[in-house]
């Protein structure tokens, strides 16, 4: 079910591409790319249990089909198998990077629990959540490619910077898509986050710029989850009124620019061009 569910496989691609960008000639990057995808898939399985989600990538989620117990246990297995493969690789640096990323992801999950149904969540906390939950694994996926190629620290840091800012860009756009995309493009129905009471940047901006009456709307729909059939449409109108969606995209472009600049120390070649193109892909998803 997990394999058939598909996905963009961006994270393992980052490991493969980063290794190639750094001139790596071996095959260790293949298993490490799999480790990265195992970690990511494990977090998705656990996420869907925590969020009681019923869809993942436009299809029924694993927890809906097989139950919470199976989803948690398979997620645990994938985490365990990833660490087993890291140990088999034999690099303490790789183990340090990916174990740190796994720990930060878990911290981000806990931090996000404090923001659900909390309209007072600030932009700084939101950014900390997406850095931890999403961007940290992007960064680790890139960094291990440079590590196994034995590149100098400056190149490792450059790829880490690229990954963290690409991850932020990706998540910012993803949160915009929850209010704008068609199911076939996003892999979930529009308004999933709204219905679950998740507070993302478009909500934060619309809430902070809104009138007292509008803020009461957000409190009712997101904090109390007292929602009617027309509330999602009204929420999108408020976001448009206060430029919340367009400003979130501007933030995404800002972080995308940082990611692009971080690749400047590498020679221009097809791999680097692909990594730059990935930034554009993440942003253009909003269109």
Model-derived features: positions:
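All-alpha prenyltransferase/terpene-synthase fold signal
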Residues: 1-287
């Amino acid at each position: 079910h997990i394999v058939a569910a598909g996905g963009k496989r961006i994270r393992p691609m980052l490991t493969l591409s980063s290794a190639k960008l750094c001139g790596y000639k071996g095959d260790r990057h293949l298993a490490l790319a799999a480790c990265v995808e195992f970690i990511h898939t494990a977090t998705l399985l656990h996420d869907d249990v925590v969020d009681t989600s019923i869809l993942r990538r436009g299809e029924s989620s694993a927890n809906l089909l097989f139950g919470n117990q199976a989803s948690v246990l398979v997620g645990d297995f994938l985490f365990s198998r990833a660490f087993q493969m890291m140990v088999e690789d034999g690099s303490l640096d790789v183990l340090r990077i990916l174990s740190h990323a796994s720990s930060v992801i878990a911290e981000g999950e806990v931090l996000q629990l404090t923001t659900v149904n909390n309209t007072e969540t600030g932009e700084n906390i939101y950014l900390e959540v997406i850095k931890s939950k999403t961007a940290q694994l992007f960064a680790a996926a890139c960094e291990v490619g440079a590590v196994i190629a034995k590149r100098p620290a400056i190149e490792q840091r450059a790829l880490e910077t690229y990954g963290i800012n690409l991850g932020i860009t990706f998540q910012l756009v993803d949160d915009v898509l929850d209010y704008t995309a068609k199911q076939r493009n996003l892999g979930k129905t529009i308004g999933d986050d709204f219905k679950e009471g998740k507070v993302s940047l478009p909500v934060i901006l619309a809430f902070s710029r809104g009138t007292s009456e509008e803020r009461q709307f957000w409190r009712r729909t997101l904090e109390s989850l007292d929602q009617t059939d027309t509330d999602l449409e009204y929420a999108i109108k408020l976001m448009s009124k206060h430029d919340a969606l367009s400003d979130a995209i501007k933030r995404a472009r800002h972080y995308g620019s940082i990611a692009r600049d971080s690749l400047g120390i590498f020679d221009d070649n097809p791999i680097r061009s692909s990594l730059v193109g990935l930034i554009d892909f993440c942003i253009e998803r909003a269109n």
